[in-house]
From Swiss-Prot:
GO terms for molecular function: carbohydrate derivative binding; glucose-6-phosphate isomerase activity; monosaccharide binding. The gene is pgi. Keywords: Cytoplasm, Gluconeogenesis, Glycolysis, Isomerase. HAMAP family: G6P_isomerase. GO terms for cellular component: cytosol. The active site is at E359, H390, K518. This is Glucose-6-phosphate isomerase. It comes from Pseudomonas savastanoi pv. phaseolicola (strain 1448A / Race 6) (Pseudomonas syringae pv. phaseolicola (strain 1448A / Race 6)). NCBIfam families: PRK00179.1 (NF001211). Belongs to the GPI family. It is an enzyme of class 5 (isomerase).
Length: 554
C-alpha cells in the first residue's frame, strides 16, 4: 500500500529502535576527539552534487550512525515514496492532489500524466508565454498608458507567491537585467504600500497580481490599493490592462478586476505555494534576471532532482540532511535549526526556508489522520552569518539548547573589496569550528594565565570562558551564487523537507493550520468595524476589540 495511505509508526521500526540504543552509546561522543583520531573523517563525511559541496563531518555521528539512519530511510520505503511523488501519485492525501513542482523543471520531451493527461506540454507552453512577456518588457515593447516603456515591476503576493521569488531575484542581483527594477508587495500593512508607492511611477509600472484563488485577502487588498493608486495618478480604466497582469487559476476574478485573459498566467492545483517559484509565480524572477537565467535556475533544480532520485541514500545530499535533522530532533531533543548564509545576496534564504520547512512539517497527525508518535518539524531561524555572530551566535555557543546549524557560503564574491571576502569565508569556517571544538576549562585557565592574571582572577573568570563545543553543523559551499547553483540549493531543501515528512508519516503539502486564523480574522474584522455587535467567543479577544474601537480614528 502507498506510504501516504498507510504511514508507518516510525518509532516501532527496527532501525528506530537501533538508533535509540545507538544514541545511548553516543552520549559521551566527542567530535574533537573523533577528528583527532581519524584523519579520514572529513573525506568520509563530505560529498558534492549539482555544484554544491557539503561537509557534514562536524556532526555527532559515526559511520554506524549514518548506516542506521540510512536503514531507517529504507524501512520507511523512502525510495517508493520518492517515486510516488515524481510519478504524480496523490501524495497530498488530505487534498487529494499530487505534488509535482518537480515537473516545472523537467525538460522538453518528458512526459508526465496527471489524471490521464500529459501536463508537460502545458508546463512548457507557460514557459513560452513567460519568455514572450519578458522579452517584450526587456525590449521596451510593453508600454504604459503614456507610451513609455515599463521600468518597474511590482509583484503583489504573499507567502509562496512572495518569499521564493524575492529570495531568488535578490540572490541573483548580479544577473539583473538593467532597466527593469523588481519590487515586492506582500504585507497588508498600509505602510508597506505607502513606502513602495514613493519609489515608482504609475505610467511605467507593471503590477503582477499573484494569487492562485485571486481571493487571498492580503493580495487582493493590495491589488485594489494599487489599482486605486494607478487611477489616482492619471491612469485610466481603458488602459488598465497595460499595467496589471495576473498569475492565477481564477481567470474570471482576474478578468473582472480588469486584467485581459491573455495576460493571465495559469497555476495548477498540483503545485503548492511554497514550491511555486519554478512556475509562473517566478515571473518577477524572470523579469529581474532574464528568461535564459530563469531556465538555468530550473536546470540546476532539475540536476538536484536527478541526484535525489538516483544517488544511494548514503551519498544523497537531501536525504542525508533530512536524516541528520531527524537524528537531532528525535534523538537529541533539538527544537530548532539555524540557517546561516555567509552571503549578503542570500539574506532572504532563511525566510524562504522557514515557510518551506515549517509550513510543510509543522504537523501533528500522520497522513491517515492518526497522531504522530514523535516530534516533527523544528523551528527554522537564522540570518546573515557575519551579522549573527554579533547577535545570536552567543546562544549557539554557550546556550543550554542544542541548535544544529547550516552554514552556506560562496568561494567567490561578485563584489570583492580588499580582503573582505577572505575574512567572510574565514569567519564562516571559524564559527563552525568553534561550535565543534569549544574551549575546555583547562584551555580557558591557561589562556587567562598567559594574560598575567592572578590565580584568583583566573578561577573567577574561567567558567565564563568555557565553550562546551560538540555543537553540530553542516557547511554548504558553492563556487559562487549562480542561477544553476541556487536552483540546486533550493531544490535540495525541498527534497530534505519531503524526506522528513515520509519518515514522520506526515503530509508535507497541505497547510490546514493556516486556514483557521484566516477564518477567525473575518469575524474579528466584522466586530472591529461594527459589522456585528455579537461578542467574540472569548473575553480576551473581545477586550482587545473594545480597546481598538475606543481609540482608533480612521
Amino acid at each position: 500500500m502507498a506510504y501516504y495511505r498507510n504511514p508507518s509508526d516510525v518509532t516501532a521500526l527496527p532501525a528506530w529502535q537501533a538508533l535509540s540504543k545507538h544514541r545511548q552509546s553516543m552520549q559521551n561522543f566527542s567530535m574533537r576527539e573523533a577528528f583527532n583520531s581519524d584523519p579520514q573523517r572529513f573525506s568520509q563525511f563530505t560529498l558534492s552534487s549539482a555544484g554544491l559541496f557539503l561537509d557534514y563531518s562536524k556532526n555527532l555521528i559515526t559511520t554506524e550512525t549514518r548506516d542506521l539512519l540510512v536503514s531507517l530511510a529504507g524501512e520507511v520505503n523512502l525510495k517508493d515514496a520518492i517515486k510516488a511523488q515524481y510519478d504524480g501519485e496523490l501524495v497530498n492525501s488530505s487534498e487529494g492532489r499530487p505534488a509535482l513542482h518537480t515537473a516545472l523543471r523537467r525538460p522538453v520531451g518528458d512526459k508526465l500524466k496527471v489524471n490521464g493527461v500529459d501536463v508537460m506540454p502545458d508546463v512548457h507552453r507557460v514557459l513560452n508565454q513567460m519568455t514572450e512577456l519578458v522579452g517584450r518588457i526587456h525590449d521596451g515593447l510593453w508600454r504604459g498608458y503614456t507610451e513609455k516603456p515599463i521600468t518597474d515591476v511590482v509583484n503583489i503576493g504573499i507567502g509562496g507567491s512572495f518569499l521564493g521569488p524575492e529570495l531568488v531575484s535578490e540572490a541573483l542581483v548580479a544577473y539583473a537585467h538593467k532597466g527593469v527594477r523588481c519590487h515586492y508587495l506582500a504585507n497588508i500593512d498600509g505602510s508597506e504600500f505607502h513606502e513602495l508607492s514613493m519609489k515608482i511611477r504609475a505610467e511605467t509600472t507593471l503590477f503582477i497580481v499573484s494569487s492562485k484563488s485571486f481571493n487571498t485577502l492580503e493580495t487582493l487588498k493590495n491589488a485594489q490599493a494599487a489599482r486605486a493608486w494607478y487611477l489616482a495618478q492619471g491612469g485610466s480604466e481603458v488602459e488598465l490592462h497595460r499595467h496589471f497582469i495576473a498569475v492565477s487559476s481564477n481567470n474570471a476574478a482576474a478578468v473582472a478586476f480588469g486584467i485581459r485573459e491573455e495576460n493571465i498566467f495559469p497555476m495548477w492545483d498540483w503545485v503548492g505555494g511554497r514550491y511555486s517559484l519554478w512556475s509562473a509565480i517566478g515571473l518577477p524572477i524572470a523579469l529581474a534576471i532574464g528568461m535564459s537565467n530563469f531556465k538555468e535556475l530550473l536546470s540546476g533544480a532539475y540536476t538536484m532532482d536527478q541526484h535525489f532520485q538516483s544517488a544511494p541514500f548514503e551519498q544523497n545530499m537531501p536525504v542525508l540532511l533530512a536524516l541528520l535533522g531527524v537524528w537531532y530532533g528525535n534523538f537529541w531533543n533539538a527544537q530548532s535549526h539555524a540557517i546561516l548564509p555567509y552571503d549578503h545576496y542570500l539574506r532572504n534564504i532563511t525566510k524562504h526556508l522557514q515557510q518551506l520547512d515549517m509550513e510543510s512539517n509543522g504537523k501533528s497527525v500522520r497522513q491517515d489522520g492518526t497522531p504522530t508518535s514523535t516530534d516533527t518539524g523544528p523551528v527554522i531561524w537564522g540570518g546573515v552569518g557575519a551579522n549573527g555572530q554579533h547577535a545570536y551566535h552567543q546562544l549557539l555557543h554557550q546556550g543550554t539548547q542544542m541548535i544544529p546549524a547550516d552554514f552556506i557560503v560562496p568561494i567567490v564574491s561578485f563584489n570583492p573589496v580588499a580582503d573582505h571576502h577572505q575574512w567572510l569565508y574565514a569567519n564562516c569556517l571559524s564559527q563552525s569550528q568553534a561550535l565543534m571544538m569549544g574551549k575546555t576549562r583547562a584551555e580557558a585557565e591557561a589562556e587567562l594565565r598567559e594574560k598575567g592574571m592572578s590565580e584568583e582572577e583566573v578561577q573567577k573568570l574561567a567558567p565564563h570562558k568555557v565553550i562546551p563545543g560538540n555543537r553540530p553543523s553542516n557547511t554548504l559551499v558553492v563556487e559562487r551564487i549562480s542561477p544553476r547553483r541556487l536552483g540546486a540549493l533550493v531544490a535540495m531543501y525541498e527534497h530534505k523537507v519531503f524526506v522528513q515528512s515520509v519518515i514522520w508519516g506526515t503530509n508535507a503539502f497541505d497547510q490546514w493550520g493556516v486556514e483557521l486564523g484566516k477564518e477567525m480574522g473575518k469575524a474579528v474584522y466584522q466586530r472591529l468595524t461594527g459589522g456585528t455587535e455579537e461578542p467574540a467567543d472569548d473575553a480576551s479577544t473581545q477586550g482587545l476589540i473594545n480597546y481598538f474601537r475606543g481609540r482608533h480614528r480612521g
